[in-house]
């Protein structure tokens, strides 16, 4: 979240510094189409000076895909840009304005309280992406916060977003984390840091919630979003019959239904599914209070501020649909000539969310169970989930153990669910597997390709971030290596498959630190 706690209202600063043109060429090729075309949704701004910036981690593979020179990024000029101290030559850094529903309550103005959009780059595959800094200092949207961030949460977002990318889940990505050399007061004094984030864009449901109340900017915003994310829709009529904008809404519904299904299949708990954290692109964004399931529990909540369990693991599809309804409300004036027709049209599209989600989830679960290409028996899935919940079985470990079961190795599964309880279910599952005629070994190998062995286990990530805060990066670097190879079994990584001990899980909480 931006600017202090995860909620609250912003206050405007009284002065806005000039957006000066720098001479630093460490990040070349930045464009500013969002700021140029939608200036009403931005405030020109500069990052705060970092007194002693030190590069902690650099995503060299991502840098190369953005056609950025790695050695230049590691130079003094490069670190200056990545820390927010120096604006790249020709850049027009801005803080982005948006609103949002936070835990169901509407906040009319949120915005980048500790972040800056430096501009856009074109990747080697021709995709336009944002380069965004997080923790770069106060902005007009800081809401009384200091605008800074600390090492632990920035490294957390770096590692988890890269793990999600390796898992094949749409996500923003991390280019770097730079320590600023300045302490920030959170739970005592902690070392400050800035994350450089790369995203398909930073357009959110909350961006539209803000724009709809700003007069003429809504339609240009919708057209920009379509051109950027769903260009196949640009040829549709833009008139008030709603073809283009209704199709745009449908595309976002589809993208988000697919995304949340992937979360549910992976055991990912986002933790703060506010509308300002729901992207138009369908990417996962904001990893502040996120976590991963160990024991399967639909009611699992890890966020310290989610007292009512609104964003519990099992609630995520319902919440996502609710967020999409808020997007629909902002687009009504673009759909049809009468309010009733507009509501009817958008409601019909929103009503398809459940079927879309169910389809993505069923296909994903079929693959996890080795039934890819087959219609999965809903009762088979539901009964497995009941068994896992009743016995507190590890979500990630269960599906790898099922593959081992097909190979004749029963010990892993026996350690998760007693044989006398899961035995009848296994017979039904094996019966379904025989229908597609694939051998047991081949099926097990296929399952291993979609069921990760390594995820960012909560206790291991927590330990790595504590060590990094104390100046020891080695545990973080090792965990990063492991979770970015989630399907590759290596004997030396066996410790990384172990769920957290019950004593840890009982008290573990996440915080909205990013």
UniProtKB/Swiss-Prot annotation:
Xref: NCBIfam families: PRK00029.1
Cofactor(s) demanded: Mg(2+); Mn(2+)
Family, similarity comment: Belongs to the SELO family.
EC primary class: transferase
Sequence positions that bind Mg(2+): 277, 286
Reactions catalysed, as given in the entry: L-seryl-[protein] + ATP = 3-O-(5'-adenylyl)-L-seryl-[protein] + diphosphate; L-threonyl-[protein] + ATP = 3-O-(5'-adenylyl)-L-threonyl-[protein] + diphosphate; L-tyrosyl-[protein] + ATP = O-(5'-adenylyl)-L-tyrosyl-[protein] + diphosphate; L-histidyl-[protein] + UTP = N(tele)-(5'-uridylyl)-L-histidyl-[protein] + diphosphate
Disulfide-bonded cysteines: none
Annotated positions binding ATP: 111, 113-114, 134, 146-147, 197, 204, 286
InterPro entries: SelO
Domain of life of the source: Bacteria
Active site per the UniProt annotation: 276 (proton acceptor)
Source organism (scientific name): Rhodococcus jostii (strain RHA1)
Enzyme Commission number: 2.7.7.-, 2.7.7.108
Pfam families: SelO
Any GO molecular function: magnesium ion binding
Keyword set, alphabetical order: ATP-binding, Magnesium, Manganese, Metal-binding, Nucleotide-binding, Nucleotidyltransferase, Transferase
Name used for this protein in its record: Protein nucleotidyltransferase YdiU
Reported function: Nucleotidyltransferase involved in the post-translational modification of proteins. It can catalyze the addition of adenosine monophosphate (AMP) or uridine monophosphate (UMP) to a protein, resulting in modifications known as AMPylation and UMPylation.
């Amino acid at each position: 979240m931006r600017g202090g706690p995860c909620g609250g209202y912003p206050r405007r600063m009284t002065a806005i510094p000039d957006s000066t043109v720098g001479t630093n060429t460490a990040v070349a090729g930045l464009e500013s189409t969002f700021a140029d075309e939608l200036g009403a949704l931005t405030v020109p701004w500069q990052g705060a000076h970092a007194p002693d910036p030190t590069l902690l981690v650099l995503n060299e593979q991502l840098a190369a895909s953005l056609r950025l020179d790695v050695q230049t990024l590691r130079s003094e000029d490069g670190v200056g840009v990545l820390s927010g101290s120096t604006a790249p030559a020709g850049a027009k850094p801005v803080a982005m304005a948006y609103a949002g529903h936070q835990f169901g309550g509407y906040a009319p103005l949120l915005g980048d309280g500790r972040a800056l959009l430096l501009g856009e780059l074109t990747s080697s595959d021709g995709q336009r992406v944002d380069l965004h800094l997080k923790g770069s200092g106060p902005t007009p949207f800081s809401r009384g916060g200091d605008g800074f961030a600390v090492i632990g949460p920035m490294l957390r977002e770096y590692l988890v977003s890269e793990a999600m990318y390796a898992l094949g889940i749409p996500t923003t990505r991390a280019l770097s984390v730079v320590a600023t050399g300045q302490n920030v007061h959170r739970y005592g004094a902690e070392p400050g840091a800035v994350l450089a984030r790369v995203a398909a864009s930073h357009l959110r449901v909350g961006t539209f919630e803000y724009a709809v109340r700003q007069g003429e900017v809504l339609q240009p915003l919708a057209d920009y979003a379509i051109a950027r994310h769903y260009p196949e829709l640009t040829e549709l009529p833009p008139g008030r019959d709603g073809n283009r904008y209704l199709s745009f809404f449908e595309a976002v519904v589809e993208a988000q239904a697919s995304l949340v299904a992937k979360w549910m299949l992976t055991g990912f708990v986002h933790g703060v599914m506010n509308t300002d954290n729901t992207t138009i692109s369908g990417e996962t964004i904001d990893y502040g209070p996120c976590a991963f399931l160990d024991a399967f529990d639909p009611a699992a909540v890890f966020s310290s501020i989610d007292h009512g369990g609104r964003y519990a693991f099992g609630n995520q599809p319902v919440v996502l649909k609710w967020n999409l309804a808020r997007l629909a409300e902002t687009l009504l004036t673009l759909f049809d000539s009468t309010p009733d027709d507009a509501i009817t049209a958008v409601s019909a599209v929103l009503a398809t969310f459940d079927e879309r989600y169910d389809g993505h989830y069923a296909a994903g679960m079929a693959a996890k169970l080795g039934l890819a290409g087959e219609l999965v028996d809903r009762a088979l899935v539901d009964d497995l989930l009941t068994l896992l919940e009743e016995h507190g079985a590890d979500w990630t470990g269960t599906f790898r153990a099922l593959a081992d079961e097909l190979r004749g190795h029963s010990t892993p599964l026996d350690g998760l669910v007693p044989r006398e309880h899961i035995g009848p279910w296994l017979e039904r599952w094996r019966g379904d597997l025989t229908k597609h005629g694939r051998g047991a070994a081949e099926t097990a190998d296929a399952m291993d390709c979609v069921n990760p062995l390594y995820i960012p286990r909560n206790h291991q990530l927590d330990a790595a971030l504590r060590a990094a805060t104390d100046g020891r990066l080695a545990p973080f670097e090792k965990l990063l290596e492991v979770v970015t190879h989630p399907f590759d079994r290596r004997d030396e990584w066996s410790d990384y498959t172990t769920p957290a001990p019950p004593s840890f899980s009982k008290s573990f909480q996440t915080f909205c630190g990013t």
